[in-house]
Amino acid sequence: MKLIEQFENCTLPKEEWTHENHFVVALWYCIKCPLPEAIQKISNGIKKYNESVGGQNTDDAGYHETITLFYTSAVADYLITRKITSVTAEILHDFLQQPFLKKEFISRFYSQEYLMSKEARLQWLAPDKN
């Protein structure tokens, strides 16, 4: 898949590193790798890519651990509950329609202040909303 190759090689144009493409990358790794390995590839890949386009991964910018793990868990749940083991055009189309891809989805589980805290960026924090 071209997106994955460009992501891994840090040749993906910055404007193509969209919210949606973050999810496509997560979907790919969650299908191709055991979950712990997928999480590592996603996390390390985002950090590496951010730096390759001039970004920094600090306690107030760049990679965000809680957001990454939250959404990777949602992707894994989607795959497991539907017994998906490969990516097809049909699966990708359905995946991209899922409610958890909407940017505001995470706000059902996290307050903005808590999610944007230094601690949440640097390490996993469980949701603060019921």
Segments the model singles out, each with a brief description of its role:
Residues 1-10:
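Intrinsically disordered, low-complexity serine/threonine- and proline-rich regulatory segments
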Residues 9-84:
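Conserved, aromatic- and glycine-enriched, well-ordered alpha/beta core segments
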Residues 62-130:
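A charged, amphipathic interaction segment
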